[in-house]
């Protein structure tokens, strides 16, 4: 039909069908008030499909028929979250919730109660939807909060996600965050059908939702009964934020975004407690799994004032439901070795279903916990999913203990490398002293060394690391920089192109910064913030390596334990040799310069939008090297917000709080100062 003009009557019918189908989706998913049976909906949809097939020039990306049809992907592309997708802090009892309320009122200097919004804590997968001029242009998973995966094609297949927002009162750019769920009924049906076909079944609806969203073939996702609910705005451009969070949810409904119906605005913490008790009693009647309630400050102005701490907002909290418990038997107690050498006892259990999840392993945390609880092999124990998530052994039922129950001792030798295991007096954790020559520690150390916040070696994932160690291609972290193309291509599923890409990423990682290098070394207690602090203080690696414990303790934010760990690390011969070898192999960084009367020193900066001359990480590192602090969220403690192209909601929050806004040119001038 190419080149043939579409009759006006047909064009009008196509537009009418699209409008009707979108309206019925809105009534079904947003209002929960369907007005036609499924059979009639299917007839409308099939009529539209036939017309679009006959007149393909009428097809638009936002047509309801275009949810499925993309080619299978080879890989999910990474997506950087301009505003981090942070998780929430948790409380598990009334005392914890009251403490949260008290902290907020003290911070705001308020004696009287104020408004909270309470909503069920959905047990699904966090998802970010980006709409430009009302059209869905990107969907991304949370990932680590800073970088997620592009799952746009899969998300388009979820019928409750509008491809085009309703009405015309939407902003130029808006990021809608929410949760993807698989309802219980759909989950049960999916598993029944999978079982009949002999296919893999899922342990619980959350795993099913996650697995469905991460299918490389969107046609598979399209067959899964997924639903999306919105609960938050991230980026916003071309429209001012409303006053309250509940107004945001009203926007969502108006735009055709489903919002969970069991949301309530309450006055003060007593109302939150009442809401919690109500949901504890009614949770099983809900169509999908929830694992607690979420409490948010209703006022967006107050949210901006409260800001964030570490990886969570101060203005919201998750109040988790009581843990669910079951009995099972301990078949064995084995030992796992972590990156820092910590030897952790793990209980191997007779599989038992707890809150819909099959639990066969549970951590015993450390040997002090193991002996305090007196858990033995052969014991009948109570297993709990704390917060419906982490399997934990609560303790043994002594009345059921068999005579041959076996008490486990701390191993004298590492189960992986057979080096000595020591447990210093007063410490709960036993450690393998094998260091980076222990295969288990080596594996975890290499994964850490290559991670995004460390040397950022793209493509060096868990399975590849394990394979390199297994094939003895890497014997310590310096082995990364001695890999040969011929050795890589000889491995299963590693072709020429894959090997070239990996070697390019490894070569690129040689140029780094001192804070990243220090973090990559995996020193106990040294996260990326402490690494930046050390780099700012010493400027040179040699000076840090020679520093005494007393010198280290004089640095702000470095406590006695961290000082001892840092000192011990650099005074171990093996570690010093590895560092020298890495430098000899080409790992390098610009020297950290001492800060002299910088206008940036002591100031806190937040970036929003894209800068032309610098990447976000380059800008943050320049701020840190100049003695300033770069954070990811705006609060009343922020001194400057640097505004690049297409700024997000941080810009609006900064304006609301009266924080200094500077453009890229002004920021570069500050750097030169």
Swiss-Prot record:
Domain BRCT: from-to ranges: 595-673
EC number(s) stated in the UniProt entry for this protein: 6.5.1.2
Annotated CDD domains: BRCT_DNA_ligase_like, LIGANc
Pfam families per record: BRCT, DNA_ligase_aden, DNA_ligase_OB, DNA_ligase_ZBD, HHH_2, HHH_5, Nlig-Ia
Record flagged with keyword Protease: no
Catalysis performed (reactions): NAD(+) + (deoxyribonucleotide)n-3'-hydroxyl + 5'-phospho-(deoxyribonucleotide)m = (deoxyribonucleotide)n+m + AMP + beta-nicotinamide D-nucleotide
Positions bound to Zn(2+): 414, 417, 432, 438
Active site: 121 (n6-amp-lysine intermediate)
One GO CC term on file: cytosol
Cofactor(s) of this protein: Mg(2+); Mn(2+)
Keywords, comma-separated and alphabetical: DNA damage, DNA repair, DNA replication, Ligase, Magnesium, Manganese, Metal-binding, NAD, Zinc
Disulphide bonds in the chain: none
Molecular function via GO: DNA binding; DNA ligase (NAD+) activity; metal ion binding
PANTHER family: CHROMOSOME TRANSMISSION FIDELITY FACTOR 18, DNA LIGASE
Function summary: DNA ligase that catalyzes the formation of phosphodiester linkages between 5'-phosphoryl and 3'-hydroxyl groups in double-stranded DNA using NAD as a coenzyme and as the energy source for the reaction. It is essential for DNA replication and repair of damaged DNA.
Family: Belongs to the NAD-dependent DNA ligase family. LigA subfamily.
Protein name: DNA ligase
């Amino acid at each position: 039909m190419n080149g043939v003009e579409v009759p006006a009557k047909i064009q009008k019918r196509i537009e009418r069908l699209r409008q009707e189908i979108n309206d019925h989706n809105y009534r079904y998913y947003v209002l929960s008030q369907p007005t036609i049976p499924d059979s009639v909906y299917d007839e409308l949809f099939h009529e539209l499909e036939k017309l679009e097939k006959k007149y393909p020039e009428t097809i638009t990306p936002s047509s309801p028929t275009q949810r499925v049809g993309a080619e299978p992907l080879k890989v999910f592309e990474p997506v950087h979250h301009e505003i981090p997708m942070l998780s929430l802090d948790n409380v598990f009892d009334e005392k914890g919730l009251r403490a949260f309320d008290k902290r907020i009122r003290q911070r705001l200097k308020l004696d009287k109660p104020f408004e909270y919004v309470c909503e069920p804590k959905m047990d699904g997968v966090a998802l970010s939807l980006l709409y430009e001029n009302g059209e869905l242009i990107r969907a991304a998973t949370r990932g680590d909060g800073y970088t997620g995966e592009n799952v746009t094609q899969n998300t388009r297949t979820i019928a409750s996600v509008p491809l085009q927002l309703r009405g015309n009162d939407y902003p130029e750019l808006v990021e809608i965050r929410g949760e993807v769920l698989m309802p219980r009924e759909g989950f049960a049906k999916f598993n029944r059908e999978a079982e009949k076909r002999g296919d893999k079944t899922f342990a619980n609806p959350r795993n099913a939702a996650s697995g469905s969203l991460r299918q490389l073939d969107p046609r598979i996702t399209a067959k899964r009964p997924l639903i999306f609910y919105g609960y938050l705005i991230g980026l916003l451009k071309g429209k001012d934020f409303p006053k309250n969070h509940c107004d945001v949810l009203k926007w969502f409904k108006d735009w055709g975004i489903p919002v969970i119906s069991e949301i309530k605005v309450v006055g003060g913490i007593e109302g939150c407690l009442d809401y919690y008790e109500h949901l504890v009693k009614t949770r099983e009647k809900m169509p999908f799994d929830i694992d607690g309630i979420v409490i948010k400050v209703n006022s967006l102005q107050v949210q901006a004032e409260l800001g964030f701490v570490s990886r969570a907002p101060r203005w919201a909290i998750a109040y988790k439901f009581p843990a669910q418990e079951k009995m099972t038997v301990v078949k064995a107690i084995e030992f796992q070795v972590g990156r820092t050498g910590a030897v952790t006892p793990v209980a191997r259990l007779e599989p038992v279903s707890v809150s819909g999840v099959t639990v066969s392993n549970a951590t015993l945390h450390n040997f002090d916990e193991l002996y305090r609880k007196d858990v033995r092999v052969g014991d009948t124990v109570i297993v709990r999913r704390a917060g419906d998530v982490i399997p934990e052994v609560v303790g043994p039922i002594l009345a059921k203990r068999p005579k041959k129950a076996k008490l486990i001792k701390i191993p004298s030798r590492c189960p992986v490398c057979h080096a000595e295991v020591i447990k210093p007096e007063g410490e709960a954790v036993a450690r393998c002293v094998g260091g980076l020559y222990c295969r288990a520690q080596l594996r975890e150390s290499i994964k850490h060394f290559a991670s995004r916040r460390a040397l950022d070696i793209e493509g060096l994932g868990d399975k590849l690391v394990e394979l390199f160690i297994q094939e003895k291609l890497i014997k310590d972290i310096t082995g990364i920089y001695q890999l040969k193309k011929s050795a890589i291509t000889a491995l299963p599923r590693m072709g020429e192109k894959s090997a070239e890409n990996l070697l390019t990423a490894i070569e690129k990682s040689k140029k780094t910064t001192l804070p990243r290098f220090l973090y990559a070394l995996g020193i106990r207690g040294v996260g990326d913030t402490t690494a930046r602090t050390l780099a700012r203080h010493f400027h040179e690696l040699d000076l840090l390596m020679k520093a005494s414990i007393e010198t280290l303790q004089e640095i702000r934010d470095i406590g006695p334990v961290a000082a001892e760990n840092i000192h011990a690390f650099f005074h171990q011969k093996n570690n010093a040799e590895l560092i020298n070898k890495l430098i000899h192999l080409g790992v390098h960084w610009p020297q950290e310069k001492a800060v002299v009367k910088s206008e940036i020193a002591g100031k806190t900066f937040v970036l929003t939008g894209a800068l032309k001359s610098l990447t976000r990480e380059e800008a943050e590192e320049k701020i840190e090297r100049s003695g300033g602090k770069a954070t990811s969220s705006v609060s009343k403690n922020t001194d400057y917000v640097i505004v690049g192209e297409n700024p997000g909601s941080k810009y609006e929050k900064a304006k609301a709080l009266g924080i200094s806004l500077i453009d890229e040119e002004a920021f570069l001038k500050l750097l030169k100062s």
